[in-house]
Amino acid sequence: MRNDYRIWLYSMLKKLLKFSFILSFPLILSACGGGGGGGSSGEAVGGGNIPTCSDNTDYTTAEYNFMGGGNSAGTGAGKYGLGTVCAGAAYGRGATGNGIDIAVLDSGISISGGSTDINDIDTRIASFQSGADIIDSDNVPEDDEGHGSHVAGIIANEKNGTGLHGVAYEADLHIIRVLNESGSSEGNSVASGLDKARGISGIDIANMSLGDSGVIGTTCNSAATCETSLGSTLYTALENFGNADVIAVWAAGNEGSSSPSVISGAALYDDDFKETTVIVVGVGGDGLLSTTGYTSDKCGVAATICIAAPSGGNGEYLYSNYSSNAQSTYGVNSYARGANGTSMAAPMVSGGLALIKQEFSSLTNAQVVDRLFATATDSGEYSKSTIYGHGLMNLAAATAAVGDLQAIGGSNNLDGNGVTYYNLADNNFTSSAAFSNALTNALAGQTMEVYDSFDRANFETNVSSFFTSGSYTSQNTIENHMLRLRPKTTKKTKNKNLYGSFTVETDGNYIESSMFNSAGGFLALGYNQSTNSFENAVDPLSNFFNDSNFGNNYLVNPYFNSGSGQDYFMSFRGNSSLGFDSFTNANGNDLGLAFNLNPLSSSEDGMKNAGDLEIVFGANYEQNKFLNSTSSGVFATGDLSNTNFTGVKYKKNLSNDITFVGSGYAGYTYIDKASNSYISGSTPLLTSSFTLGLAKANFIKEDQRVGFFINQPQRVEDGSLNLKVPTSSNSDRIVTYNNLNVDLEPDSRQINFDIIFNKTITETSNLSANLTHVKNGDHAKESNSQNFLSIFYKKTF
């Protein structure tokens, strides 16, 4: 068995013509002021086989294109390389490789000026964390051959605006020299290098652009035969490496074989390290398996753990660093050389895995590998799995959501028992107009995690994106004014037309005014189909347009604004009544109760000069909502939130023609928590509303009436909501939640100004007009003022 595991030099040292081209390259670099490459002048790249990327153009710079041989203007052949795997799309999503540790087992790294200090290593590489030289038994892995420097640069060359950058240009590298100046291992240097890498804390990925002349599936076709072929020392090191949960990336080999080399493919027969092993074959400038310049091995029997990536070949090269000991330099502390072979394809994938790993902290290393495979381009030419395995690496797809994005509920473990996932469209919260934009304003800039349905990869989104500000605007449109002007279902009781919810009219002086004839005293029990539901039970004449004769306009107080339902209102005695409402609407189920007491209505005539006073006590119970907000999914509220409220209504006849009216309501809302909801609690919410106004009869003529009113719709005056949202997750699949306490008081106060005019035309018909001005609509400071004019003619038959 041979233990001389040769690196794949990909014809670099054999092609003197190409070497001469590189020597002349400094002249081009100097003229362009940075960047460069050589070895191929072809402009057409891909030959129709490489898929088109929607890369973020902010990142497709000359530095981006350099690796693929592009010129300093960022055009031409440079579209090969990073552009082939759609790296720009991943960069646009924030992936850089930052914080990901990658071990490079190779021939070492170029050292500046022959230094023996690891900190002086060529600064083109973004970040060095450690180094080891297995060959010379020290900690300075100086590259005497050049191959390792080239590989390291493809993975993590720094992005600094000049020259070229690597795939994961902010990754941390750990350089372990396991190959000598001839590009061969010595003794058990590869096994020792694997053990060394495994012992480095935090290593996520290891790149091995090295191989042997054997072919997987022949002499190595089972765990036992692979161990025999490789030797027990190396095979044990491979097993231990896999058990350490480090992703191992291997070059397939450059022999043109039907399957990869033995050392890269041994994992196929051993589950201990199969799930974290990736074998890489190379595609050339035309997107096809490289057969010119070098001939890549095929995926063959190892297709399930194999993928394709750019490697140079078929008329193209990949450019990267090269050791000063083996290659002429250009620029300060920079080295560049074109090369081809699966040794170049492997670091492309190692860098790609680093981007995926950084982007999705919730994934285990095995899941990172699964995602790499699942998102590869596998259509057309790349559907040939015996050649390309899972297909061509696609970093745009790998860093995007796979399947539906979902919110987690019910657990802090992504795979835990009882965990529930909700599609994003099923999670929303529309605020009540009572607290308007308070939630969206407070949550601006706050982020939370959501997860895709493929492997629960974590994505960041704005919490506020699930929230919509509540609005009274729908009540202020002309169309809705017309709806409000529409008479309610009518019934007759003692020859009295009843509009809106039924009420008790035991005292004409209280209910009616001098503006029209009193109906006299009577008792009534009735039913009505209402469009403004419980507010009518609380305050039967809830807006200016519900009454047929305008006389009760002063009773308006928009404390509740609910959906349609059934209202009941019943009298117990001359000065008290009970309202009851039960309904279902789009926002959930409500049950409301109200008790009205008029302490002055049955008083002596002399007391009535003090005016008419009504005191209201009540409660409103809401199912799956509060204050008429709507919510679902992880923002749902519980089955029974309740509001306890009280109100005072007062009327005083200032003269035979002029009446003062006023009312005010206040209440506390207690929010019920739902299971799996991010709404984890709240303080009691204090709300209020008020109405003040003057009504004048005999305006100009006896058949004309006018009213001037000012009112404030229901508004939260004090109270807060606590949200507990997921903000991070780790590879142990544990989710961390963060508490957000949100003040629900809106940033302004809506005030409505109304002028109402009514003219009696005949005993059965009248004409009404209403002019409304709305200031700070929806209690929002940024709202524009609104004006509405409504005209309504009504005839009773």
Language model feature labels by segment:
Residues 33-45, 54, 59, 96-97, ...:
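Substrate-binding/access-modulating region of protease and related hydrolase catalytic domains
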Residues 462-654, 665:
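Outer membrane beta-barrel translocator domains of Type V secretion systems
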Residues 106-109, 267-354, 358:
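Extracellular S/T/G-rich loop segment that most often corresponds to the catalytic His/Ser-adjacent loop
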Residues 152-155, 174-179, 202-204, 312-388:
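Hydrolase catalytic cores
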Residues 51-56, 60-61, 86-132, 137-187, ...:
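Subtilisin-like serine protease catalytic core
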Residues 536-538, 543-562, 566-571, 578-585, ...:
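Outer membrane beta-barrel transmembrane domains
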Residues 79, 86, 204-209, 276-279, ...:
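C-terminal subdomain of the subtilisin-like protease fold in secreted/lumenal serine endopeptidases
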Residues 784-797:
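Outer-membrane beta-barrel "beta-signal"
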